[in-house]
C-alpha cells in the first residue's frame, strides 16, 4: 500500500486471514463483510477476497454482497482445493459472477498444482516452495491472530480451525534450566 501511495504503483493483491479476523463488530463478533468492504475501498473491486476464514459458502456470499458480481477474484486457502474450487465456481456462476476468478493457495508446489489440472482454478498463490525450492525442507510457520481488543478471534474454516484467545506457554525444565518440552 505504501509503494502505491509513494510511487503511483497500482495496488493489487489479496489479504491474510488476520485482516478478516481484525474486523469485529461492537460485540467482538467477526465481521467478514466489514473486512471485505475495507479491502475493496483500498484496492477496488478487482481485488482478491479471501473467503475461507470462517465458512467458504458464506464467505463467497458475503464477498458478492459487498463487491457485486464484478469482483476480481476469490481466494481459497483450505480444504480439498479441487472439490472446493468446483463448488465455489458453481456458486459464483449461479450468482452471475462468471468473470470472477478463483485463486488457490495452501503450501502449494508444482505437484499440488498439477493435481488441480482440470479444476476451475485461475491462479495459484505459491510462497514456501518458491523460497525454498521443491523438495527442500520447510518450516510450516503461519501467523495466527488470536485476540482483538480483548475479544478472542479464530479461523473456523474446515480443516484449519484455530482457537481464539491469548495463550501462555507452560514449559518443563531440566534441573540445569534447559527447557525440554511444553505442557
Name the predicted role of every residue range:
Residues 50, 75, 102-105, 125-127:
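Short, conserved beta-strand edge motifs with alternating hydrophobic and charged residues
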Residues 1-98, 110-115, 119-120, 132, ...:
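Buried, small/hydrophobic-residue-enriched core segments of structured protein domains
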Residues 93-95, 100, 108-183:
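Gly/Ser/Thr/Ala-enriched C-terminal appendages of enzymes
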Amino acid at each position: 500500500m505504501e509503494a502505491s501511495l509513494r510511487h503511483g504503483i497500482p495496488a493489487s493483491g489479496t489479504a491474510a486471514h488476520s485482516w478478516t479476523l481484525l474486523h469485529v463488530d461492537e460485540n467482538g463478533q467477526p465481521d467478514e463483510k466489514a473486512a471485505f468492504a475495507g479491502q475493496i475501498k483500498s484496492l477496488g473491486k478487482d481485488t482478491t477476497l479471501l473467503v475461507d476464514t470462517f465458512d467458504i459458502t458464506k464467505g463467497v456470499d458475503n464477498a458478492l454482497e459487498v463487491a457485486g458480481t464484478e469482483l476480481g477474484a476469490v481466494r481459497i486457502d483450505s480444504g480439498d482445493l479441487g472439490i472446493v474450487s468446483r463448488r465455489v465456481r458453481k456458486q459464483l456462476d449461479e450468482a452471475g459472477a462468471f468473470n470472477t476468478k478463483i485463486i488457490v493457495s495452501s503450501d502449494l508446489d508444482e505437484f499440488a498444482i498439477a493435481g488441480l489440472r482440470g479444476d476451475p482454478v485461475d491462479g495459484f498463490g505459491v510462497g514456501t516452495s518458491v523460497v525454498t525450492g521443491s523438495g527442500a525442507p520447510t518450516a510450516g510457520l503461519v501467523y495466527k491472530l488470536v485476540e482483538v481488543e480483548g475479544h478472542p478471534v479464530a479461523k473456523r474454516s474446515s480443516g484449519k480451525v484455530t482457537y481464539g484467545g491469548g495463550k501462555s506457554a507452560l514449559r518443563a525444565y531440566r534441573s540445569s534450566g534447559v527447557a525440554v518440552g511444553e505442557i
